[in-house]
């Protein structure tokens, strides 16, 4: 146990918490939407924040119809996303490295619980030079049920051998917050694309403006 408080671990979401990736995803989807005349694509993307690739496709097909060429459009969006990211367009959120360094210094266990596929997660964390901070990485293709179900957070806690009630979860999306809360963790919300609604205010233990504020909070515990 660290000397700061009774929590032993911090489990991070990735997209929108560690990387400013959701802003880039929205931007790339808007390019594809303008090309093909897809309406309300930002609204569709917001509905999919925090869930895995399989469920994202299901929601797009439900919204636009079973004949919607999702795989083709998603492929174009992904290609544009990765081209932009490779050119330095995928930025770390402010305060990430400072928070990770603080957690290591104070002997927290650190895990990742991301709905994104493992190959993508590991590639992005490696490129950013922060993968070695994480004791365990759990991804969307490693669990049966996606967020908002608690599976991914329960698996992460099990992998680092820490009880869920001894973990903080850092999330930005509603589905991610529901997942961590249902797993029995104290959730710190750092809003990204969506502000905290009444449900989030009820189930989060803190709502913070940035990861710098997370570090400040833990320093005071």
Ranges and model annotations:
Residues 60-98, 106:
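Metal-dependent phosphoesterase signature
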Residues 1-8, 101-104, 117-221:
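Asp-based, Mg2+/Mn2+-dependent phosphohydrolase catalytic module
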Residues 2-47:
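Active-site neighborhood of HAD-like aspartate-dependent phosphohydrolases
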Residues 31-36, 98-108:
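A short, Lys/Arg-enriched amphipathic alpha-helix followed by its capping loop at the start of a domain
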Residues 32-33, 52-67, 124, 156-157:
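Helix-loop "lid/cap" segments that line or gate small-molecule binding pockets
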Residues 17, 114-116:
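Conserved phosphate-coupling serine/threonine residues in phosphotransfer and NTP-handling enzymes
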Residues 24, 48, 52, 91-95, ...:
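Short beta->alpha linker loops
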């Amino acid at each position: 146990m660290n000397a700061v408080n009774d929590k032993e671990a911090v489990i991070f979401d990735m997209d929108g918490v560690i990387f400013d990736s959701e802003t880039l995803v929205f931007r790339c989807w808007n390019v594809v939407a303008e090309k093909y005349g897809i309406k309300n694509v930002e609204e569709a993307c917001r509905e999919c924040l925090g869930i895995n690739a399989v469920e994202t496709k299901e929601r797009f097909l439900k919204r636009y119809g079973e004949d919607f060429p999702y795989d083709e459009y998603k492929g174009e969006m992904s290609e544009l996303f990765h081209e932009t990211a490779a050119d330095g367009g995928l930025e770390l959120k402010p305060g990430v490295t400072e928070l990770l360094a603080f957690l290591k210094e104070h002997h927290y266990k650190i895990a990742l619980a991301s709905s994104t596929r493992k190959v993508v997660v590991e590639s992005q964390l490696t490129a950013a030079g922060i993968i070695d901070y994480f004791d365990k990485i759990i991804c969307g293709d490693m669990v049966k049920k996606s967020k908002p179900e608690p599976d991914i957070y329960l698996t992460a806690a099990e992998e680092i051998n820490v009880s869920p009630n001894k973990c903080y979860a850092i999330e930005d999306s509603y589905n991610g917050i529901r997942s961590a809360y249902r797993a029995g963790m104290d959730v710190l919300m750092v809003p990204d694309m969506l502000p905290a609604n009444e449900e989030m205010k009820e189930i989060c233990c803190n709502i913070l403006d940035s990861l710098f504020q997370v570090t400040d909070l833990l320093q005071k515990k």
